[in-house]
Amino acid sequence: MHEMGIALQIAEIAKSAIPKTPADLKVKAVNLRVGKLTAIVPDSLRFCFEIVAKDTPLAEAELNIEEIPIVAVCKECYTETIITDADFSCEKCKSGKLDIISGRELTVSSIEVADPEEMKQAQKKSKKEK
C-alpha cells in the first residue's frame, strides 16, 4: 500500500504551506488532483491521511480528491482519446501509438484554512453546550 507514504507527503506539504500563527489554526480541507495512472485508491488514501493527520492542524481536514482521467493523443491521427479501460488504443484509428497527456498527476491543488472568527464562534458554541 503506497498510499501511506503518499499521505505522509501530502500532510507534510499541507503543514508547510499553512501559517504558523495563530497556533490553533485548523485546516478545513486539502484538495488533490490525482491521475488514474497513479494507481491510488482514494478511500485508502483518505484512511491513511486520517491516520497521519491525527494530532496536527490537519486533524479535522477533509481530503477532497479530484480524479483526473487518462487522456492520450494518437501519434498516427492526432485524435485525443480518454482511456477508460486496459485497451490503450486510439478510439478513432485503433493505433496503439499514444502519448499520454494526463492521468499521471498527483498535486495538492489547494488547502482551505478555517476562518479564525469561525473558529472562535465554534469554540464559544461548544463551551455553551457543555
From Swiss-Prot:
Sites where the protein binds Zn(2+): 74, 77, 90, 93
Organism: Desulfatibacillum aliphaticivorans
Keyword field contains Zinc: yes
Name of the protein described by the UniProt record: Hydrogenase maturation factor HypA
Keyword set, alphabetical order: Metal-binding, Nickel, Zinc
Lineage: Bacteria, Pseudomonadati, Thermodesulfobacteriota, Desulfobacteria, Desulfobacterales
Residues the record lists as binding Ni(2+): 2
Top-rank taxon, per record: Bacteria
PROSITE patterns in the cross-refs: HYPA
Function summary: Involved in the maturation of [NiFe] hydrogenases. Required for nickel insertion into the metal center of the hydrogenase.
Similarity field: Belongs to the HypA/HybF family.
GO molecular function: nickel cation binding; zinc ion binding
